[in-house]
From Swiss-Prot:
Belongs to the eukaryotic cobalamin transport proteins family. This is Transcobalamin-2. It comes from the Eukaryota. GO terms for molecular function: cobalamin binding; metal ion binding.
Length: 427
């Protein structure tokens, strides 16, 4: 009888484990190497380069940057509050070149929670009001019949709701309704995995905070819908959508237990795929690295409801400098076929150059022009050969033959003989 009881207890434990998404420990040296990639970014303290996501996710990781971390938060507060509050009721933006977007404001609010702060006082109320106005504007753009689109994206819409929820600020039911409608199975459009994951995190925060009680049943159903969508999006290799949407998807799945072994199995498979991608050097972009670090520490944005600011974290040390090797010259073909006349040119650059380096060299050679805009994930193209991307258009990067690139112009490094195409596409 005692053995039967022990067996039933063991089966119960295994069953409970199967219901949750757990990521087994990853080699600490690999995690530290990832964190070291962020240190140079933390020296970039201009408003254009400040990235609240770096601070948030470092605080949720097992790593710390000491005084560099403190200076970064101070610079965030100085830059964001002066820029956003200084221009809140004025047309004069002063030194605010590249004023933070509302998505960046939402991330800034997450950064405050990561430091165990709530927005308070007159300044805090203004920031909250700005974010609420942004959500109201997006709600109107979507329309009463839901046939419109947000000016930014449903990703930023969900991020805005999440940020307010983490600061215990309620949003109107009608604002939540737009995100619920977009993610419900009968009338949802095509939303990326990271958009679904961000919406799922927002819904999870609302549910755990007991906000919008009149929508509780729909919120619970939406969490289930998002979980099903993400699990169905798992690739044969194990990624959810693609390698770069997997960390945020895992953040959501870690907050969303379900009966049976499917969830646990899917998360273990994703861990194997992520580990392979890490070893291949796929994570070089600061934003992508920062979203991965909390997952490797078994943390999510939902932990910011009750953040632990006293948890021990390992001090990051700068990576040892490597002796530069003599670099060979490679040839990369750059082409733009979606414009008339088409452009096609072979460009010689150093091995290890990025697409951005190729674009700069093409511009120096003449006959090619382009413009970029800064974002939290790095620069992106807004104009090529004088043709600016219009509303709901963007300049896509492809590797011949017809393979869309997941990395941006500052991250992807073409190999010798590759052809890179810039294509204007609609979405």
């Amino acid at each position: 009888m005692r053995h039967l009881g022990a067996l039933l207890f063991l089966l119960g434990v295994l069953g409970a484990l199967a219901e949750i998404c757990e990521i087994p420990e990853v080699d600490s040296h690999l995690v530290e190497k990832l964190g070291q990639h962020l240190l140079p970014w933390m020296d970039r303290l201009s408003l254009e380069h400040l990235n609240p996501s770096i601070y948030v996710d470092l605080r949720l990781s097992s790593l710390q940057a000491g005084t560099k971390e403190e200076l970064y938060l101070h610079s965030l507060k100085l830059g964001y509050q002066q820029c956003l509050l200084g221009s809140a009721f004025s047309e004069d933006d002063g030194d605010c070149q590249g004023k933070p977007s509302m998505g960046q404001l939402a991330l800034y609010l997450l950064a405050l929670r990561a430091n165990c702060e709530f927005v308070r006082g007159h300044k805090g109320d203004k920031l909250v009001s700005q974010l609420k106005r942004f959500l109201e504007d997006e709600k109107r753009a979507i329309g009463h019949d839901h046939k419109g689109h947000p000016h930014t994206s449903y990703y930023q819409y969900g991020l805005g709701i999440l940020a307010l929820c983490l600061h215990q600020k309620r949003v109107h039911d009608s604002v939540v309704d737009k995100l619920l409608y977009a993610l419900e199975p009968f009338h949802q459009g095509h939303h990326s995995v990271d958009t679904a994951a961000m919406a799922g995190l927002a819904f999870t925060c609302l549910k755990r905070s007991n906000f919008n009680p009149g929508r509780r049943q729909r919120i619970t159903m939406a969490v289930r819908t998002v979980r099903e969508k993400i699990l169905k999006a798992q690739t044969p290799e194990g990624h959810f959508g693609n390698v770069y949407s997997t960390p945020l998807a895992l953040q959501f799945l870690m907050t969303s237990p379900m009966p049976g072994a499917e969830l646990g199995t899917a998360c273990l498979k994703a861990r194997v795929a992520l580990f392979a991608s890490l070893q291949d050097g796929a994570f070089q972009n600061a934003l992508m690295i920062s979203q991965l670090l909390p997952v490797l520490n078994h943390k999510t944005y939902i932990d910011l409801i009750f953040p632990d600011c006293l948890a021990p974290r390992v001090m990051l040390e700068p990576a040892a400098e490597t002796i530069p090797q003599a670099q060979e010259i490679i040839s990369v073909t750059l082409q733009v076929l979606s414009l008339l006349p088409p452009y096609r040119q072979s460009i010689s650059v150093l091995a290890g150059s990025t697409v951005e380096d190729v674009l700069k060299k093409a511009h120096e050679l003449g006959g090619f022009t382009y413009e970029t805009q800064a974002s939290l994930s790095g620069p992106y193209l807004i104009s090529v050969m004088g043709k600016a991307a219009g509303e709901r258009e963007f300049w896509q990067l492809l590797r011949d033959p017809n393979t869309p690139l997941l990395q941006g112009i500052a991250d992807y490094r073409p190999k010798d003989g590759e052809t890179i195409e810039l294509r204007l596409v609609s979405w």
